[in-house]
């Protein structure tokens, strides 16, 4: 296993102020046992970037560059959300502010359920997928950001289930396990989730 040169800087900024994401990432990075300190951007008083991209990849890169520019350190950003094909992929990149106010999970869930009412027919399942894109930049103007993408397929429930997780987890049903994402432990979720998948690709990149 070769050592990435950004390891030499001794730290990596995690470009997120979302407490739920930060908690999941801290657990995932703990499992990786990287020889670098992982610093959530909030500890450096880095404000959220303006996410004006049109895709998960664009927004992840924007956030990573923003954190790296302010901190002067390598940075990793996550852009993620839930996509529902019958809604044309919505909420998509607007998942965190689907109902208008950023980070209002209850309102976002309620809006998604309401928007899906016209599509509920004869108990048919409505497909959904969680998407996570990780972008790693070694410096703010890195011309070759590393991109890692995970997609987690499931269905959208008619009512919330479970108390764990955050965001749309209570509405995300895993038919093969017969549980919602919010009924999984953090450890079990990280093994199979969109974010866990993307982190696994990141882990594999470190072994090349």
From Swiss-Prot:
One GO cellular component term noted in the UniProt record for this chain: cytosol
GO molecular function, a single term: ribonucleoside triphosphate phosphatase activity
EC number(s) recorded for this UniProt protein: 3.6.1.66
Sorted UniProt keywords: Hydrolase, Magnesium, Metal-binding, Nucleotide metabolism, Nucleotide-binding
Known cofactor(s): Mg(2+)
Binding residues for substrate: 16-21, 80, 166-169, 189, 194-195
Record's catalysed reaction(s): XTP + H2O = XMP + diphosphate + H(+); dITP + H2O = dIMP + diphosphate + H(+); ITP + H2O = IMP + diphosphate + H(+)
One Gene Ontology term from the biological process aspect of the record: purine nucleoside triphosphate catabolic process
Pfam families recorded: Ham1p_like
List of residues binding Mg(2+): 79
Binding note for cofactor: Binds 1 Mg(2+) ion per subunit.
Annotated active site: 79
Superkingdom classification of source: Bacteria
Family according to the record: Belongs to the HAM1 NTPase family.
Record-linked HAMAP family: Non_canon_purine_NTPase (MF_01405)
Assembly and interaction partners: Homodimer.
Task of the protein: Pyrophosphatase that catalyzes the hydrolysis of nucleoside triphosphates to their monophosphate derivatives, with a high preference for the non-canonical purine nucleotides XTP (xanthosine triphosphate), dITP (deoxyinosine triphosphate) and ITP. Seems to function as a house-cleaning enzyme that removes non-canonical purine nucleotides from the nucleotide pool, thus preventing their incorporation into DNA/RNA and avoiding chromosomal lesions.
Name this protein carries in UniProt: dITP/XTP pyrophosphatase
């Amino acid at each position: 296993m070769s050592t990435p040169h950004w390891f030499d800087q001794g730290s990596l900024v995690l470009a997120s102020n979302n407490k739920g994401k930060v908690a999941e990432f801290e657990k995932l990075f703990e499992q990786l046992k990287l020889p670098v300190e992982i610093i959530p951007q909030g500890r450096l008083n880095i404000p959220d970037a303006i996410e004006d991209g049109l895709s998960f990849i664009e927004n992840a890169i924007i956030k990573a560059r923003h954190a790296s520019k302010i901190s002067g350190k390598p940075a990793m950003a996550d852009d993620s959300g839930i996509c529902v094909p019958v809604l044309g992929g919505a909420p998509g990149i607007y998942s965190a502010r689907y109902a208008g106010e950023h980070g209002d999970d209850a309102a976002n869930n309620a809006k998604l359920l309401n928007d899906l009412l016209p599509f509920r027919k004869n108990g048919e399942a409505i497909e959904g997928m969680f998407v996570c894109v990780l972008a790693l930049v070694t410096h703010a103007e890195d011309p070759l950001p590393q991109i890692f993408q995970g997609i987690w397929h499931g269905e959208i429930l008619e009512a919330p289930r479970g108390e764990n997780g955050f965001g749309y987890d209570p509405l995300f049903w895993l038919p093969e396990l017969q549980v919602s994402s919010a009924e999984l432990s953090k450890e079990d979720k990280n093994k199979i989730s969109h974010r866990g998948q993307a982190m696994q690709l990141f882990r594999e990149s470190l072994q090349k």
